[in-house]
């Protein structure tokens, strides 16, 4: 690999990481808007699709991941407050890392940015939410959730993918 192509891959990774960070924030905003709209439509009768277990005390996958990382690295579980603080760190770190992978992929194969990043978001949803998290015991198996939860996750990740690609393209120039 030439120095020029290595430099381009690094630039792509950096642009993708920035895109992934912005996209992680945008995804959070989208999910809050979805939950508010659902609450208004249903009169608050249904739980939020993102709260796969439901309720204020439910631990999401990022909190469980943070706890698992702490257990491996520090030999101890996190407290509830520590999980609440560490969960977003996991979310944004994962978003940045996946954005960096995406940015490098686009440098190697420009067709990877097809359809403005929607396929990237959809693949990430399938790989993370539907396969990796259940396999690692960080969420229930996909069959345990209603179709609306899967749709919520897919659309949320499509928002992440489009935002990652948009920001990556702007940063990369």
Go through the PLM ranges and name each one.
Residues 1-173:
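Short amphipathic, positively biased membrane-proximal segments
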């Amino acid at each position: 690999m030439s120095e020029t192509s290595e430099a381009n891959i690094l630039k792509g990774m950096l642009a993708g990481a920035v895109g992934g960070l912005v996209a992680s924030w945008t995804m959070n905003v989208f999910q809050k808007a979805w939950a508010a709209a659902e609450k208004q439509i249903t009169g608050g009768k249904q739980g939020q699709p993102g709260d796969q277990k439901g309720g204020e005390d439910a631990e999401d996958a990022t909190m469980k991941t943070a706890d698992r990382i702490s257990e491996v690295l520090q030999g101890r579980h996190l407290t509830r407050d520590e999980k609440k603080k560490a969960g977003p760190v996991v979310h944004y770190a994962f978003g940045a890392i996946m954005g960096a992978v995406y940015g490098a992929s686009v440098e190697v194969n420009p067709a990877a940015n097809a359809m403005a990043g929607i396929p990237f978001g959809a693949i990430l949803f399938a790989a993370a939410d539907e396969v990796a998290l259940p396999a690692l015991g960080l969420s229930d198996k996909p069959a345990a959730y209603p179709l609306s939860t899967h749709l919520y996750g897919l659309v949320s990740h499509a928002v992440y993918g489009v935002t990652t690609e948009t920001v990556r393209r702007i940063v990369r120039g």
